[in-house]
A protein has these predicted regions:
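Short, charged/polar micro-motifs that form catalytic or ligand-binding hotspots
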Residues: 90, 94, 199, 203, ...
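Extended, charged low-complexity regulatory segments
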Residues: 1-210, 214, 218-219
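Conserved motor-region signature of P-loop NTPase helicases/translocases
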Residues: 118, 123, 165-268, 272-278, ...
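Alpha-helical nucleic-acid-binding subdomain
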Residues: 253-561, 568-576
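Conserved helicase motor core of SF1/SF2 NTP-dependent helicases
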Residues: 278, 282-286, 291-295, 302-316, ...
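Short hydrophobic beta-strand that contains or immediately precedes a catalytic carboxylate
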Residues: 213, 562-563
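P-loop NTPase Walker
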Residues: 1-44, 191, 196-326
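Short, flexible loop/turn elements at secondary-structure junctions
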Residues: 108, 235, 267-270, 567, ...
Length: 733
């Protein structure tokens, strides 16, 4: 149904009226927040002026405590009021820019007049008229917008079910107090591009196509049964858009038990995280947690290794280890490349995961490796002594539990060592270097030991013993800290042991079928470990082994994980994520045709990823219609990818792609420069030159910069370790 000019004018007028009322409320609230803030500052400033402190008698003490409590309660009330008013003010400031995004007209059964209900991120009441101008998207009546098309509808309220008829469903895109898009629809459209299509077109066939696309996406958005939902979709089919709408829907439907910080999105790269934070529907909530898999690896392993990122690995694979870019090819270089490729395949597979699980079982009986406990270049406990102690425990005790027992034993051994070490000459030398503050703290401890009696350092032996313990405690602190973090376990040695010919474990039982170039794989792995470098294909197996031995740091608070571009994850990585989040559901979005890491992808077949939760708990949804590119582009690209005939193009016309073959790089660069100049003349503000590899991009930048008058952008976006890999928990791990 096409909107009339009269309807459009009425909606524009309403937006103006509503935003004006919100602006008035913002002004009032800003004044209120300012006054309350002044109250808080004044109360804090004169807090003790208003409190009478007299502890001379028990009665006076009680009155003093009551006076303090009363003043504290006044301060707490003002602070609560300030926090709540500031929170409301923040919502109103967002609301005034984009007051609502939906409208439904509803006639309750038995009534004659229809009610227009506008939905936004928060409710807004016109206090003079006593009427809600905007309803919160979480209000009971809002479910009509998400769950129904126009027609017979019903929604649940605390007082029972309300039935009636929805006569209109209208969607808006309002920014900066102006309506950008507006259209009537039968289904709720969440994708921005589809909104634009519906807003600009009155063609019935186009509306039918868009409605069909949204219904397909709704199967993804509203799926609430599958433990693992796999979405296989062509490029531009709206997988990510559907996933973001799915987040919105799940937060809405389970708003009483699911919050945004219990959802995690693993996105392809840090730039995508910024994009996602701007596209989530207007929920009035914080965004869900977002990270990249690389950032998580950096967070967990960055202190131990220089961790290779996936793009560096990919660059190596695509350039054949540099063989494709001018290097003189030799049989040794070719073999090195093939060996690395074989290692990537092998270490990314579930077969290698099974080997590590078997290796863990073997370590319960034999093969554990430990670092000796050292202090000031002195070996306190040898690695052999630690191995002996470890295998003295009951073999039925799990590895992580045995290590906890080892930790407690080691801390006890350090206490015994300290009693002997206290007599060493270096301790007296350190005592001489103690500051007056450290002497004073030791004196305070002595008073506590003496039960509060006034004491002095008259006894030299007592003084020396107390100060020596202070010195030893400080110097042993790093050793104790390392023990508490289980750093006495030689994890690098344990992982490397898998690749050593002579090892304390029987690898014949573990690795029955060795991959090609096994000897070269072993040599390269050990060499990288010795240099404190961890290739990307080793990062997840190393982390998995570390957690299998020391105890998994599972995150039980997260309830839903969304993996975008899942085709770029290996089977091993997906299995690790399942182990990391044991109580969550998972949504995996990907496209077999877009697997940039096809040498190690779980999406090379659907079966490995579907096997994570089993067929009973897994559902696969396939999207075939690509609507983000023109028909001509889709028809061109579907001729390149396997099974491309199944991809359906959208009815958007455009120019045909051109394939130009040149005889040499010089001709290529001249043609590119001419094409860029033409596009700039036509007014294009942003032009991208896409290459297969980073080295090709570097080459293109060097060649094109002298040929172009306009500046050619050049930026790198490396992975950043640290906070990016942290995943918050509502409850302790």
């Amino acid at each position: 149904m096409s909107l009339t000019d009269q309807a459009r004018a009425a909606e524009k007028q309403r937006v103006q009226e509503v935003t004006e009322k919100i602006a008035v409320k913002i002004t009032e609230l800003e004044e209120q927040v300012g006054l309350v803030q002044s109250d808080v500052v004044e109360i804090r400033k004169h807090y003790w002026d208003e409190v009478t402190m007299d502890m001379s008698t028990a009665e006076d003490a009680v009155e003093s405590i009551a006076s303090m409590r009363q003043q504290s309660e006044v301060l707490s009330e003002r602070e609560r009021t300030h926090r709540q008013a500031s929170k409301t003010l923040g919502k109103l400031r967002r609301l005034v820019q984009s007051p609502y995004f939906g409208r439904i007209d509803f006639i309750e059964r038995g009534e004659r007049e229809e009610e227009a209900v506008y939905l936004g991120i928060a409710s807004f009441l016109d206090e003079e008229a006593g009427q809600y101008l905007i309803y919160d998207w979480r209000a009971p009546i809002s479910s009509l917008y998400y769950d129904f098309a126009p027609g017979e509808v019903a929604f649940a309220t605390p007082n029972g079910t309300v039935e009636g008829q929805m006569v209109l469903k209208r969607q808006f895109v309002i920014r900066d107090r102006h309506i950008h898009l507006m259209f009537d629809t039968g289904v709720t459209i969440g994708d921005e591009l589809l909104k634009q299509v519906l807003s600009r077109s009155s063609d019935a066939q186009m509306k039918t196509i868009v409605a069909t696309i949204q219904k397909e996406q709704n199967r993804i958005i509203r799926n609430d049964s599958a433990q693992m939902l796999i979405v296989q979709g062509a490029a531009g089919s709206g997988k990510t858009s559907a996933a973001l709408q799915r987040v919105a829907y799940l937060l809405y439907k389970h708003r009483d038990k699911l919050s945004s910080d219990q959802m995690v999105l693993f996105s392809p790269n840090p730039l995508f995280n910024h994009y996602v934070s701007t596209v989530l529907p207007e929920l009035g909530e914080e965004n869900m947690q977002q990270t990249t898999y690389q950032a998580y690896l950096e967070h967990r392993l960055g202190e131990m290794f220089e961790v290779e990122d996936s793009f560096t690995q990919l660059e190596y694979v695509l350039t054949r280890g540099g063989l494709d870019h001018g290097s003189e090819q030799t049989p040794v270089m070719e073999e090195t490349y093939e060996a690395r490729l074989s290692g990537i395949y092998y270490k990314s597979s579930t077969a290698f995961l099974a080997i590590i699980e078997a290796y863990k079982k073997q370590l319960e009986q034999m093969g554990m490796l430990f670092n000796p406990i050292k202090f000031r270049d002195k070996e306190v406990l040898s690695a052999a002594r630690l191995v002996e102690r470890f295998y003295s425990y009951d073999s039925a005790i799990r590895l992580p539990n045995r290590l906890e027992l080892m930790k407690e034993w080691l801390l006890e051994q350090l206490e015994l060592f300290a009693e002997v070490e206290i007599e060493e000459a270096w301790v007296d030398e350190e005592i001489e270097l103690l500051s007056s503050d450290e002497y004073h703290r030791a004196y305070i401890r002595l008073r506590k030991m003496e039960g509060g009696r006034d004491s002095s350092f008259d006894d030299y032996d007592q003084e020396r013993h107390l100060l020596a313990r202070t010195v030893l405690k400080e110097h042993l602190k790093p050793v104790r800290s390392a023990v508490k973090q289980l750093k006495f376990v030689d994890m690098i040695g344990l992982y490397g042991q898998l690749f050593r010919e002579r090892a304390a474990t029987d690898k014949r039982e573990l690795i029955a079928e060795k991959p090609r170039y096994w000897s070269e794989i072993c040599g390269r792995t050990l060499e990288e470990l010795a240099q404190a470098r961890l290739p990307y294909e080793d990062a997840t197996p190393f982390l998995y082994l570390m957690e299998a031995v020391c105890g998994f740091q599972t995150n039980s608070a997260v309830r839903h994980v969304i993996i975008d571009e899942a085709q770029d994850y290996s089977p091993f990585q997906l299995a690790y994520l399942k182990r990391l989040f044991p109580h969550c559901r998972m949504t995996a979005l990907g496209d077999l045709s877009q697997a940039i890491y096809s040498h190690a992808s779980a999406y090379s077949e659907i079966d490995p990823i579907a096997a994570l939760y089993g067929p009973e708990q897994t559902e696969v949804i396939r999207l075939f219609r690509s609507y983000r590119s023109t028909r001509e582009i889709v028809e061109f690209t579907r001729g390149i990818v396997p099974d491309g005939d199944a991809i359906e193009p959208f009815t958007r016309a455009g120019g045909k792609p051109r394939v130009i073959q040149t005889s040499d790089r010089g001709s290529l660069h001249s043609l590119l420069a001419a094409e860029v100049a033409r596009l700039l003349d036509e007014g294009y503000a942003s032009i991208a030159i896409i290459t297969k590899t980073a080295s090709e991009a570097e080459l293109a930048h060097q060649a094109l910069t002298p040929l172009l008058q306009a500046p050619l952008g050049r930026a790198r976006h490396p992975f950043v370790s640290g906070e990016g890999g942290r995943i918050r928990c509502r409850t302790p791990l």
